[in-house]
Amino acid sequence: MKDCVFLVADKNMEATFRGFLEREKFHLSLGVGPFDFDVIVDSGGNDPGVYNYGHELLMPYQKTHRYAVVVLDQAWEGAPASHEIEQDIMANLTASGWTATDCTVIVIVPELEAWIWQDSPHLETAFQFNRAKLDVGMRDWLKENGLWPEDAVKPP
């Protein structure tokens, strides 16, 4: 039996989770022992699908995994509040056979992409953005060049 299955809403989340969890000795960053896992993606690749059907997608994994983690963004048209999303999914998971101690829900507010696009020198390094040469941060440069709308939490 494997330790954990992660159900994520889309390919971007899958890449993020795999990028972290597939690093050598990743568990040390979490302060836990090593564990094995699977990452699965909602077939529709969206947050509402995980919200509505995540418990169904995870039912077969009750026999093969000890724990389940559901991860989705809170940002979609008509989305309930994050605490309601968490409560609803947990209720569905427990009704479908998971115990409350063996599963959890992570609701990312506002959404994963907004967290990734935070104003950070690490992001600038990843994009090989030369702040010193341009005398401006990457976020400001994108805004000045019309690539990041003023009221947006991330570029389109």
Where are these regions (language model features)?
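Conserved SAM-binding loop
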Residues: 6
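Helix N-cap/beta->alpha junction signal
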Residues: 9-10
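C-terminal accessory helical subdomains adjacent to catalytic cores in phosphodiester-
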Residues: 1-3, 14-41, 53-156
